[in-house]
Amino acid sequence: MLRLVVASPGAFSPRGLHDRRVVITDSADSPLAYGSRIGDGYSIIVPEVASFHFRPGSQDVAVQAEPLVAPERVLDAYYGAALPMAVQVVLERQPLHASAVVVPGIGAVAFAGVTHSGKTTLAYGLSRRGFPMWADDILAIDAFGVEGVSTIRLPYRLNLRAPSAAYFEGRPETGVARGEQDPGEWATAPLVAFCVLERRDRRPRAGSSVVRLPPTEGLMALLAQAFWFEPQTSAERRQMMRDYLEVVARVPGFRVSVGPSLDALPALLDEVEAKVAACLRPAA
């Protein structure tokens, strides 16, 4: 597990831009966060908000906030930028840009995709059908866990956008209460399926919105949504590739086409449920 701690004043000196590499960008490809490393120390810098510092072998992620920055902005920077990088460096697990739910008694289903693709909306919609939320926006994957490919439940704050929140407000939940205790942060669950979301400007004309991905396409789709620290060594790059190759070799993947209208969400959730359930059902 990881824990966020406040760095003592002056513990870390600022680094010049020439020593930094972009690690996270926004939808317009503008830099949001930078990475830097000195010896065995790693830093994530979110300009005008905070810098975060961590190293292998320590559970602490030390934060040094800029003056007068609201705590909420610092926490947003931690969850969105520092946490995924610390997962890779400290925990040696792969952070994926994904939300996830749990199929009780079976395992986690991930929904990966770019910002605004509908990850949180789909996961939250399924949570209202009786599949508890497991992750929002960042999912930690352990490709070589004791029980195969597994996930780690990271700390998160639900980031349901205003149109989706308005859509769900007042609509009844349809899931049956399952009476399971919340496993809490840092719990683990097998990864039993992953879905890569593809945003469409218009509703698909015909055919399925949920299509099984062959492993090669699944690998490329997951790598497109993977977080990784920069600068990255060749050994770290090889390990990341080994991990994702293991994921696509053992876990079924799907491409999910998401249209622009929330009115189509119930039908899409029905199809996701049916396709994933059919894949998880034991062969006769």
Residue spans for each PLM region:
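Long, basic/Gly/Ser/Thr-rich N-terminal segments
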Residues: 1-70, 75, 270-284
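N-terminal pre-Walker A segment at the start of P-loop NTPase domains
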Residues: 75-95
